[in-house]
């Protein structure tokens, strides 16, 4: 009705944003980050090749691409930032909105139609916009597209393989950047083997961060051979005696624990019940597809951020790019799950999952630990994990 009245000249429609303008948050890069950020910018001027940014978890890769985004926004360019899961949008949206107030839009399949319409209005009215999205945001009708960021680029969630059209968002991002003559940066602490290979062949410019932000220590990794009976404690067939002891120490220090069990369904429920018996005074929660469906992504993660949860047990969802500030211990219950699957990528995926998950610990403090339970401690993947040697492992796979 309003649109019709406007056509008749009886009223005028305008958009009004009631939100008060906020002050832009000031951030600072370390010397290592500044060097890499400046190198990426200068290399783009020279050859405009896609950039692959790697480095240990917690090294500040996000701050580097925020610095890159800033240079594009200041030149009235728009930016797309892709994340693999809806659950990751909330944290990244807050970070980007602090740095670029009023310019950030979230976009995903669970949004209300009204929110999407409001987002499209902002896209239309603003010359420079930042979209934080899952893979669907890659098709947003942005003008002046200057940069595409694919965070956690190794994630299989970027692949649409359940319905037509089938595509990999990373590859679509590569093509859109070519069509729009924009820049592309792929970001991951454990890149996909394809991207690593492309960097080896000089198709991508490769950059890596070797130190954690603020020089926090990486977690000390302890590998437990679960073939040894002495690693077990009576009443616990899945959790080693060492892991139980370490959990108790961390709980007494009022810190939090993440546990990874990459198995869906009853196995996770069984482990959850074991944890309840072992640590009856602790608040324990699950983070898997069933619990997310019941409580929602944001409810579980927000409760953990607010320290309402002491131990969070999850499937592979728990390993993906979330910045937990109070986690001092992570435990991989069975690092071998998935190794025997008929998939030539099985070992690569296990390495990436464990590498990402271990990086959730000690992001804002020293003294963190990671305990990896395995029946194959001599496998190349386990030995590479213990030494944080990603290049050696990828060269072994290639």
Regions found by a protein language model. Give the residues of each.
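Pre-Walker A adenine-sensing motif
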Residues: 34-44
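Short, well-structured alpha-helical segments
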Residues: 2-3, 37, 196
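Interdomain "pre-motor" coupling segment immediately N-terminal to P-loop NTPase/helicase cores
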Residues: 1-20
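Inter-lobe coupling/hinge segments of SF2-like helicase ATPases
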Residues: 24-30, 34, 47-129, 133-398
């Amino acid at each position: 009705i309003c649109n019709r009245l406007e056509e008749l000249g009886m009223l005028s429609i305008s958009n009004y944003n009631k939100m008060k303008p906020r002050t832009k948050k000031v951030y600072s890069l370390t010397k290592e980050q500044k060097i890499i950020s400046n190198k990426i910018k200068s290399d783009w001027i020279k050859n405009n090749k896609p950039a692959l940014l790697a480095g240990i978890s917690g090294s500040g890769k996000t701050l580097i691409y925020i610095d890159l985004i800033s240079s594009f926004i200041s030149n009235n360019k728009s930016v797309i930032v892709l994340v693999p899961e809806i659950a990751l949008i909330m944290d990244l949206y807050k970070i980007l909105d602090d740095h670029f107030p009023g310019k950030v839009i979230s976009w995903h399949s669970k949004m209300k139609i009204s929110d999407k319409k409001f987002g499209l209005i902002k896209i239309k009215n603003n010359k420079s916009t930042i979209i934080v999205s899952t893979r669907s945001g890659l098709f947003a009708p942005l003008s002046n597209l200057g940069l595409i960021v694919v965070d956690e680029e190794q994630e299989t969630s970027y692949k649409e393989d359940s319905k037509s059209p089938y595509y990999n968002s990373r590859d679509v991002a590569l093509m859109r950047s070519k069509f729009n003559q924009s820049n592309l940066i792929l970001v991951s602490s454990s890149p996909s083997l394809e991207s690593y290979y492309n960097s080896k062949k000089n198709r991508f410019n490769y950059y890596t961060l070797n130190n954690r932000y603020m020089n926090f220590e990486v977690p000390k990794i302890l590998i437990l051979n679960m073939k040894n009976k002495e690693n077990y404690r009576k009443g616990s067939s899945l959790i080693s005696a060492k892991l139980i002891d370490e959990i108790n120490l961390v709980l007494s220090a009022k810190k939090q624990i993440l546990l990874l069990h990459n198995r869906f369904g009853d196995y996770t429920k069984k482990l959850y019940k074991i944890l309840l018996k072992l640590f009856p005074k602790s608040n324990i929660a699950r983070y898997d597809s069933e619990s997310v469906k019941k409580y929602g992504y944001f409810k579980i993660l927000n409760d953990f951020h607010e320290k309402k949860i002491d131990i969070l047990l999850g499937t592979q969802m728990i390993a993906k790019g979330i910045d937990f500030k109070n986690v001092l211990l992570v435990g991989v219950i069975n690092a071998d799950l998935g190794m025997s699957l008929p998939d030539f990528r099985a070992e690569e995926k296990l390495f990436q999952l464990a590498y990402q998950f271990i990086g959730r610990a000690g992001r804002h403090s020293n003294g963190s630990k990671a305990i990896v339970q395995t029946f194959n401690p001599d496998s190349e993947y386990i030995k590479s994990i213990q030494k944080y040697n990603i290049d050696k492992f990828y060269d072994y796979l290639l």
